[in-house]
Amino acid sequence: MKPLVIFDLDGTLVDTPSGIVSAFITALRDLSMPFEDRRAIRATIGLPLEKAFGQILALPVEDERVTAAVRQYQAVFREQVLPQAPGLVFPGVVEGLALLKGQGYTLAVATSKVFASAKALLEAAGLWSYFDLVLGADMVAHPKPHPEMGLLAMSRLGADAATTAMVGDTTHDLLMAKQAGMAAIGVTWGIHTTDQLKAAEPQVIVDTFSEVVGAAHALLKLSSSPVSYC
């Protein structure tokens, strides 16, 4: 059975958070619902868009204004952020994914984006070909931090929790991993602070993508690579 590493997308593989925040602001301004609190918007990254806009606008996710905001945001993201995607890939990601793939790992993405948006971003960033499976929030009944997405990835790819690790920059990612019984690797270059990540009790927190590779080896017992535990 091949070891499986599942990655979050925004803030883990691609440095999209600032673009996401700007797209939120532009979309709401376009709809005459101005909201300029960048910190509050940034805090919602990692949630499905409906929940994020519902939280920001203090509206139920079923409200038509939330639906309109999501639709407008997606249009703005396509126009403003996707063209920049090749330059937004975090340092070491391409090399690390290629190394893991070459060493026999199965690779997947589990994201709070809907599948079509995730596919568009991965393709624009030049990362699509590395992944055996991409799961979006619209492919499960319960998105992160619920374990369903992690369990579905393992089921589809024939993996088990003992040989699976989740890599992410938010507690949503790490809590999903914990509840699914798999190892969790937190990364410090994304949305949540190191203290926030520690609160989710991952097995390890790393500062560079090359350390992700070493942590995967160590946690999945494929080598004696050193790893610094929290």
Curated annotation (Swiss-Prot):
Disulfide links within the chain: none
Gene Ontology MF term list? metal ion binding; phosphoglycolate phosphatase activity
Describe how expression is induced or repressed.
Moderately expressed in the wild-type strain. Expression is repressed by the HTH-type transcriptional regulator PecS. Weakly induced under oxidative stress. Expression is 10-fold induced during infection of Saintpaulia plants.
Q: Which domain of life is it from?
A: Bacteria
Signal peptide location: none
UniProt KW keywords:
Hydrolase, Magnesium, Metal-binding
Needed co-factor(s): Mg(2+)
Residues where Mg(2+) binds: D8, D10, D169
Q: Which InterPro entries match?
A: HAD-like_hydrolase_sf, HAD-like_sf, HAD-SF_hydro_IA, HAD_2, HAD_sf, PGP-like_dom2
Q: What happens when the gene is disrupted?
A: The disruption mutant cannot synthesize indigoidine.
For biological process, the GO terms are: DNA repair
**A Pfam family in this protein?**
HAD_2
> What is the E.C. number?
3.-.-.-
Give the annotated active site.
Answer: D8, D10
User: Which EC class does it fall in?
Assistant: hydrolase
Recorded GO cellular component terms are: cytosol
Describe the task this protein carries out: Part of an operon that could be involved in the biosynthesis of the blue pigment indigoidine, which is implicated in pathogenicity and protection from oxidative stress.
Similarity comment? Belongs to the HAD-like hydrolase superfamily.
PANTHER family given in the database record: HYDROLASE-RELATED (PTHR43434:SF24), PHOSPHOGLYCOLATE PHOSPHATASE (PTHR43434)
Q: What is this protein called?
A: Probable phosphatase IndB
The organism of origin for this protein: Dickeya dadantii (strain 3937)
